[in-house]
Amino acid sequence: IVDLQRYQPVVAVIAGPVGCFGGMSIAAGLCSYVLVTREARLGLNGPQVIEQEAGIAEYDSRDRPFIWSLTGGEQRFASGLADAYLADDLDEVRTSVLAYFAKGLPARPRCRRAEDYLRRLGDLDTAEQPDAAGVRR
């Protein structure tokens, strides 16, 4: 994915309720641009995996509003982890993908901004459960 960006932008589209987790979330993070819809979810681990490891009191995978407030498309866009927030509409997604191809490569690719993301992680207070507003800071 990173090597392809020498030639043209690589655009990830994350749509629908299944989510983009694990290796696919890493692949999305390497793309030139990440486009998400309202139903999209993006994270290294899925809600069930986090619940299994942390416990249901910490992370209830059945609490859909809670899950989407942390990993949903709107949240990922608002927190800067996605470049566009789109309607779940095929024509809008198609138009946006073409627009991002036409835009060309970003001045500083996401894969070259690791220090920025590490700084953001370092600023988190791990003693407290994150909420939607805290994730956007």
Region spans (language model):
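Intrinsically disordered, low-complexity segments enriched in small/flexible residues
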Residues: 95-137
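Conserved catalytic cores of soluble enzyme domains
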Residues: 1-107
